[in-house]
Amino acid sequence: FCKIIAGQIPSKKVYEDEEIFAFHDIHPWAPVHFLMVPKLHIPSMAQVAPGHAGLLGRMMALAPRLALEQGCKPYPEGGVRVVVNTGLEGGQEIHHLHLHVMGGPRPWLKG
């Protein structure tokens, strides 16, 4: 993700500030699916240190706001899912900490 943040690999940007970069997932699992990454390279949640608490708190607080801007309905009727995969057995494929932010209608659940 460092190359995406640096603009060396194209992405569809959702948000950027001095510490955080968010962009659409190239293989979405939901109508709204984007990734939020810290610009600081942290390989995974397993390497998070106490000094990263403010950054991660900002990311978690920002996720639902960005999801609303991308078309998710607000809580409680709508909502959002935030997922962090950590390590091989946790499903992590890219070794740069990232949040998957997903939401939107799920018509397959209606029955």
Regions found by a protein language model. Give the residues of each.
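HIT superfamily nucleotide-processing domains
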Residues: 1-111
